[in-house]
């Protein structure tokens, strides 16, 4: 075994790429390290494509092994199971920039598996996973227009930081991942604290500039370790068939795309395509209908793009910078804690907000450590939203990714736990879809949070931008439709406030997207965002003054931290009885903070009263009503407060001489006592006769 190793400095860390030792039966295997975070990336491609396949079956599997962090998995089986949300998101992060680098017409199955085998808790594994994937594909011999670079960019004290550590990220106003080739940015994913557009654009340019060292290193690694290129050539177009398809369908498709209603347009496009295929079959029964379908799709794309480049109205009749008609409603569901219905053209989101206590927060145990997520946002895309049938069940990768994007857009304006001690779960149900449903979820979430009384800092709106570029001519489109996303060259989603950007996601399908184009897109997105915010603010301009009557109200009190064990009781008996008997939820913190949650105000008051009883100190000289709990020869023990007992000595029972305690007191008898003394050991001395004397004097 002769390993080939390439090392280089990248930001604060040393990156090492190694091949030739592990997983040698794969087409390519790279052990990639950034500091102590190490991933094994393998690539396998099938040499032959399945006959008739008209799509590229690329699979990216990213898996985090708990042994990488020196942990044993939880649960009964004690082994890793289905991918976590974090694993799904990182798999998508890797997939998105590499997919457009495979050539058109390449339909061989390719599988990339990234396994995290060692992790430094200060170095996230996503960037080195992207670098390792790029290196493995570069040396595999599989057709791939790489290499690809990747970088994380932070923004701390007005300065960009390359590949910040986890600790640095906690103090950063920006968490941006950018990936691209030597000449083009291909993918951006980010979360920001309402930063100006110029700062966001600068971070993309900075990250792309910095990753050139990665691209150069992988090119050198490929020169030394690369396998022979596959003997693959792109399929040659059947020019005669192309001309026939154009003649039969171009005019009909152009006419169909004059129809502005989505379902009607789709129906007419289907009619045109069916007629073209029927005519081709009549002329040549041996014609390959799959090839015809591909040519019709290409022609359809050319027709729509040509209209836009020529300055003609878009598919639905809008100008490039126009936003579709908006409808905004807040408080649409009677029993939810907050709700909103946001409609933009043929895209609609029904969004709900539910408030819970701290114990409702999501506990996440990953190889990077444990964390608690108080704000959750879940996105659902049922098949009826696009007029189709389909499977309904656990969320797919796309739904998880869109939900996380919307979460990033909102997270910057969420209140702290001190400002709002609730866990918050938002669910966005996409009830109609024709493009930009994730950004509709951002708008709907902002509205639902305000309706629920969550004190978010300000409203947030999102917009999806698109691009059509032919040569040097380009048109940036605001609020793209589903068709414009599919047929265009860029999907550019921006969420933010009036003051700045909170989330930016960009996927680019072509090279040649310049800084100028991105700048125009960001400025056009800002205008669209402000327009949407103006409409949203007319429906609900700020958060409600109070939370819903149906939501749990959290009341916070402070107790002596030394009294926490008294509230909990032996084996949790006291707090269990408190919650069951009052119907409240009670949470205790180490500093003595007690949070009582209930939608019933009287129940909360009763819980507070009982907690104050349990934690109150015994006062010398004070009169208490107590209960006899034990009788002994020398007196009786009386309970005066929860968990607080004292001794009434036989001499303190009565002014008369007492020979037998049982002649005067019995178990469970209620008596009035006066606290005479609390000694250094906390023992309480009580008197019945002194209490009677004091009461008599008061009368």
UniProtKB/Swiss-Prot annotation:
Any GO BP: mRNA catabolic process
GO molecular function, one term: magnesium ion binding
Residues in KH domain copies: 552-611
Residues noted as binding Mg(2+) in the record, renumbered to the chain: 485, 491
Entry's transmembrane regions: none
Residues covered by the S1 motif domain: 621-689
Function recorded in the entry: Involved in mRNA degradation. Catalyzes the phosphorolysis of single-stranded polyribonucleotides processively in the 3'- to 5'-direction.
Oligomer status and interactors: Component of the RNA degradosome, which is a multiprotein complex involved in RNA processing and mRNA degradation.
Name the UniProt record assigns to this protein: Polyribonucleotide nucleotidyltransferase
Organism of this sequence: Shewanella sp. (strain MR-7)
Gene: pnp
